[in-house]
């Protein structure tokens, strides 16, 4: 359904995280729906007042907003930066930090400038804006530590061979605490998550049942990072452009409450394939059909009972 109408049904100050990836302002129309580039900024900003209203003071708004080229010329559009600036200047959001999602498996695009004329590099990075309602949103970077580098692993085994605690020429003080094992390294704001899934349960069941696959899915590791980073178990996560409901799946696996909005009923119904445990796969066709006719469907998960209900294309 219309995400703006559905947002109106949420209570003020009730949401801990809005995590979403809206249809980008691409020059070519997509089957999943995307606004014309000239109208896009105003269209997307139409959601800003309601997003800010439903967010808690400690809440965050994370938006994956990839870039695009201007029509017919090898010059980048600034639409996503205009969205960011206006969200902050006109609607009072705070830019907590900018992240960049690097997808090493992304295909070269646009074909005209990259493949044919070879005058531009492959576009493999999406800006991801982390915005907040106040200056102090809830966050804990220690919950999303990454694996140490091989060199750091060697240092932890035998610190004396690698460095001596002292002040560096740069003025930085490297103490003996540098060799402490903290269970992982703090992540940077460059997030490398390949988007190369080709054999997931969702894709297999869509193929078996001849159900249309959502064509613009981000990898689950992306929303999982921000759900872990910015919320606690039991918090409420909302995706206003859910597509195949990857954000909802990430939230479910991390024991968060979640609500997802999607304008295409078929996409939101098919997203049930991501949640079905192995012992319920035989029910996939029945559950999918029930959801298409707005009949709630529940099934047992390893740790809980999930009631999956499509209500005006919201689940």
Task: Locate the predicted segments by residue.
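S-adenosyl-L-methionine
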Residues: 1-7, 273-314
